[in-house]
Amino acid sequence: MKTWKDVIGTEKTQPYFKHILDQVHQARASGKIVYPPPQEVFSAFQLTEFEAVKVVIIGQDPYHGPNQAHGLAFSVKPGVVPPPSLMNMYKELTQDIEGFQIPNHGYLVPWAEQGVLLLNTVLTVEQGKAHSHASFGWETFTDRVIAALNAQREKLVFLLWGSHAQKKGQFIDRQKHCVFTAPHPSPLSAHRGFLGCRHFSKTNAYLMAQGLSPIQWQLASL
């Protein structure tokens, strides 16, 4: 069984990666509030091991409000109101998955535990400043994560919502993997084709056609 350490462990020794961590450390040391907390920056990889990945949902950078980000794209900690993009994901789920009921939270850990890699392409952000760490070099790291999944796994589902995710996933081998694209679930664009995309049921149909168990998208209320 290959682990993330086997596949991308050497990235940690690369100068660019050390430079990322140095910049994040300097930001925290200077008194800036950086999300998510240090122990949660790599949560997506801890919760969804390399060989366990079935579905990859690509986000952008972490939420930049207090207590929101915890290392999984689109997810927020329990007790925090689900942000608008996630509410649109829930809205689509109610239309797409029979019986889906919107939970009272936005904590997507149960998805991660079933093999949904919730991958932001930038893994840290300064409080209140969207995209503030976009130039740190995280994109190089997450490009290599996606490249490793593309090359060393097969029959994955990639959900690419919005132009940023679609650009990030442009090199995915569509002969080996299933790629679904739609506008971003943000309120600015959801009505242009995210709502009605049926990506959640399409994902499960593909997985079942490969003899894999479907994702249970329903989240129990907390």
UniProtKB/Swiss-Prot annotation:
Q: Where in or outside the cell?
A: Cytoplasm
Which keywords are on file for this protein?
Cytoplasm, DNA damage, DNA repair, Hydrolase
Listed GO MF terms:
uracil DNA N-glycosylase activity
Transmembrane segments in this chain: where?
none
Q: Where is the active site?
A: D61 (proton acceptor)
Domain of life, per UniProt, equals Bacteria
Q: Which SMART domains match?
A: UDG (SM00986), UreE_C (SM00987)
Tell me one GO biological process term.
Answer: base-excision repair, AP site formation via deaminated base removal
State the similarity comment. Belongs to the uracil-DNA glycosylase (UDG) superfamily. UNG family.
Protein name stated in the entry: Uracil-DNA glycosylase
